[in-house]
Amino acid sequence: NIGVNSVFLARLFVYLHQFFEKKRNGTMQSGKIINDPVFGFINIPKGIIMEVVTHPTMQRLHRIKQLGLSSMVYPGAQHTRFQHSLGAFFLMTEAIQSLRGKGVEISDHEAEAVKLAILLHDVGHGPFSHVLENTLAPGVHHEEISLLLMKQMNRELDGRLDLAIRIYKDEYEKRFLHQLVSSQLDMDRLDYLRRDSFYTGVTEGNIGSAR
């Protein structure tokens, strides 16, 4: 029986792996629209952005709560780092469109890269987000881990994250692109203020991000 069960489980594993790979590949070729409770429909275009969104390193953020243990006090705070990353991506898309409308020159490659940078900005978070950050790896901040994971993904993706990493590290000549990712008024903050406010019911963070 043990031998039969082992063969069955092995075949099941292979089948499920092939099934999800086909589904993932099909999604990457067609893109995806996600309905977000904070911002509404978010369009995930096919190509490198979809590859990053569906990558296992990114998908693990589904299981990491944005506010750690805050749900013990605010039961509605069940939202995840994955949701936050998509929200920040949406705001980055809006910001790029707004800047272009004001005459700021941003190439398609730069626009794609800065969207990738904001998508991956929190990929280094561990269990319970900030709660265990200094316990699991003392002296190492999640931004450093995010960069390490981005570099690993970049190797897997044949260097297609090169510009995104340069923007993330503030090594690209158009420094305002980095400021959209990390500054006193970036897409990260604009999303988590609204998102945390929405899910906790605390109105103080409900700012007008569209402005």
Question: Can you name each region flagged by the protein language model?
Answer:
Residues N1, N5, K22-N25:
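Polybasic, lysine-rich low-complexity intrinsically disordered segments
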Residues S6-L9, L16-F20:
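Short hydrophobic targeting helices and cationic amphipathic motifs
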Residues Y15, N25-K65, M72-L116, G124-R211:
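Sequence-structural signature of the catalytic-core scaffold of metal-dependent phosphohydrolases
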